[in-house]
């Protein structure tokens, strides 16, 4: 078996994927296996009893939103009795930031990979709620539920109608341009969100709707510097899924956290998760909060690093250090270090500060274990209690043991 050839095949599929944002649809209509009593979440599999505060809160909010329960107590009883199922977004071609909770009637972005060569595939992500009290951080007040209903009845349909007129938005091209404008695609999405708004605005203006709804949607998108994060995550999911299931490949195709555990998936080991307790991110905190308030790492957004952006592209986004900590030199060094554990330089994602060198892409579990260098991840930091919200942002690395577990499983499977 030629491992290098397998890895070359996998990383080529990842880089040559061409994810197009083509529409918005109800989760139950498009996500494989979705049904009314299934709640999807970020990270590897987890039972209700082990869920951290933010994830529990988001699950309660989703049950209230779906009217599976009418009070917090009813939602908790339903969860404890097994009346609802909890499964990872990743196992349903889906990703979501922070808690990542996605339920049947929620509208989701549809991202179709339309590569020039190779097989197409599709990925999904929920819509971004903006800032403040939001479901993804475990809030479930009436204010949160009202915003979710507005997103389902106004925001989603309006954006969906605009996308139907667009012929699709090329997200690979959008990400590539944003990297040349100071974004890294995970914690800093200011340029990408403006490019997203620029593409949508003329089309939204043509959508028929209630008086004022177009301007309401444009303001909501314009005020949210994370508006493009969810489509970008779905794009990265489409890219990494294109590389999943290559026999003999040692490349990582998912890194995901549920607030309790950190899990990875490996291309040549389909159907398996390798997990260990998630670390607590270290970074800068908003006024009034400290490291003691932080929940362990949570969210599917590390799919960005898995695809070669985010923490792997920090050299493109020196200003991010004002948010996650460190200096511009640290941002540059973070990217340089990641070349040590990856198999390729991205053909389409390049960084001006490194003479337009391609971002480090294709995490190789062999290199991670051999060198003792774990991937770098930029991340928001959630409060450990449900509903408090984001309390800061910083950096985190996966526990090394999961790469060791994966390498041992690989050796066993392939008789090495």
Predicted regions and their residues:
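Anaerobic metallocofactor- and corrinoid-dependent redox/one-carbon enzyme cores
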Residues: 1-416
